[in-house]
Amino acid sequence: MALLEIIHYPSKILRTISKEVVSFDSKLHQQLDDMHETMIASEGIGLAAIQVGLPLRMLIINLPQEDGVQHKEDCLEIINPKWIETKGSMMYKEGCLSVPGFYEEVERFEKVKIEYQNRFAEVKILEASELLAVAIQHEIDHLNGVLFVDKLSILKRKKFEKELKELQKKQKRE
C-alpha cells in the first residue's frame, strides 16, 4: 500500500467531473486500499478518488466507532453512486482534507438513499442519515467537481477566501 498525495484547494483538478468506473480489477482494489491508508493517515472520515488525482467515480467513507477507532472492515467503498432518494434538510459543520483547517456549516439532506457498486462490481443499496448521510453527500459532490465551500453563503465564502489568503501568506513565511 502507498500513501497518496491529497490535492488541495484551489487546484483545478478538484473541479474535474469524475468518470464511471468500468474495470473492477486488482488495480482498482489497490487504489481503494491506497485511498483508505491515505485517508486514515490524514485523519479523515471520507475521501473521493479525485482528491488523490484519480478522476473516477469512487469514494470511501470510514466513520469511527464509539471507541473512536476507524476499523478497515467498516469502510464503505462506494463506486458509481446514483441517487435514489433524498429527504429533509439539516445544517452540519463540515471540513475537508482538500481544504485543511477550515470548517463551516453547510445545508445537507437529512436522509439519503443511494445505489452503488462495491469493489467486486456488486450492486448495493444504502440508506443513511446523520453523519453518514452528510459524508456521502460531501464525497459525491467531489465526484461532480463541487466542494463544500461552494455551498457557503456569499458572506461565509468571503470569510473563507480571506482565511485562505492569510494561511497562504503564513505558509510562505515559514
Curated annotation (Swiss-Prot):
Binds 1 Fe(2+) ion. It catalyses: N-terminal N-formyl-L-methionyl-[peptide] + H2O = N-terminal L-methionyl-[peptide] + formate. It comes from the Bacteria. Keywords: Hydrolase, Iron, Metal-binding, Protein biosynthesis. The keyword Metal-binding applies. Fe cation binds at residues 96, 138, 142. Its EC number is 3.5.1.88. It is an enzyme of class 3 (hydrolase). One of its GO terms (biological process) is translation. The active site is at 139. Pfam families: Pep_deformylase. Its cofactor is Fe(2+). GO terms for molecular function: metal ion binding; peptide deformylase activity. Gene3D superfamilies: Peptide deformylase. The keyword Iron applies. Belongs to the polypeptide deformylase family. Removes the formyl group from the N-terminal Met of newly synthesized proteins. Requires at least a dipeptide for an efficient rate of reaction. N-terminal L-methionine is a prerequisite for activity but the enzyme has broad specificity at other positions. This is Peptide deformylase. It comes from Helicobacter pylori (strain P12). The gene is def.
